């Protein structure tokens, strides 16, 4: 029963958004005509119109928000206008597949539902929890607004795609969706993308060990916790036999570089920014321990972290804070410090540096998980089942 699917994304370009790209190619392989509307990237994904491997991608210019919550009103308003404009140009579709944040695409979904389309809500983030975690404003007017937008999105959705069981529970309890209307499509690394390459010892800057952080650097991502933990690794554990690489970019990149200098870590850490895949593989293949420092907050506790999945795909042992979904994802492939306890986080890093056999065992367990129960093959089946349910 394949037809024409329109996927809407606002916060990343495609195919840089790996989850959306996996979903797009899975649908293409199942016979769907797939269109994606997303923002243009700044250094990659810059073409306005492009077809890649049979997926038609329509991009629009977007300036990222600055200046706190009100800055997002301008960003999201612009994104909504461009998305609506491009959707009109694409014409009738059978399924509108909206990825959040923000929880605004239901406005387009409602219009297209009146023309016969089904609406799938792919909930990448719990936006109310994201708001509380990112902005220290409490349950103010804007918080109540994002709650209303989430409820409207749930009401509009024929089917909800959740990234894990915690999100599924929210869709049923807070969103009022029936169990057969919610499908768990876990984010999973593309196994063919993550493979070991020979370690590059020069990345260790002459030290015996290398630590690595991979991912976005936003206010809720915990890079500041990682840096303070590394300062404690040096000061409390007396360890200076390591070098650390922080791979990725984001809103707090400059602030984190400044914090590393304040902590006296300038000679211990490198910040690479976003790098090509071949360089990413060199860093992960060289790393002895990988860091997942996301602090406990309302969002992180129930979210699946892509970096954890990617560390496991590369067979790297992980140090994480003790978060609900982190333990579901990594299992015994990680050691867990009490939430937000930087001293314990540092102790666990030191423990793994001194135990190469445990590092090897944990890495093998992680690889087995992403090749088995957490593989994209299982997610592929759930995605296609969600589409079948949306178009009975």
Regions picked out by a protein language model, each given a short descriptive name:
Residues 1-56, 159:
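N-terminal subdomain of nucleotide-sugar transferases
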Residues 25, 84-85, 107, 111-115, ...:
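Membrane-proximal helix-turn-helix segments that form the acceptor-binding/catalytic region
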Residues 161, 204-230, 245:
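Conserved donor-binding/catalytic core segment of Leloir-type glycosyltransferases
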Residues 166, 187-188:
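Carbohydrate-associated surface elements
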Residues 221, 278-283, 292-313, 319-328:
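Nucleotide-sugar-dependent
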Residues 247, 254-281:
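Nucleotide-activated donor-binding/catalytic signature segment of Leloir-type glycosyltransferases, i.e.
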Residues 334-343, 351-357:
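Conserved acidic donor-binding segment of nucleotide-sugar-dependent glycosyltransferases
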Residues 351, 358-373, 382-385:
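A short, well-ordered alpha-helix in the C-terminal region of glycosyltransferases
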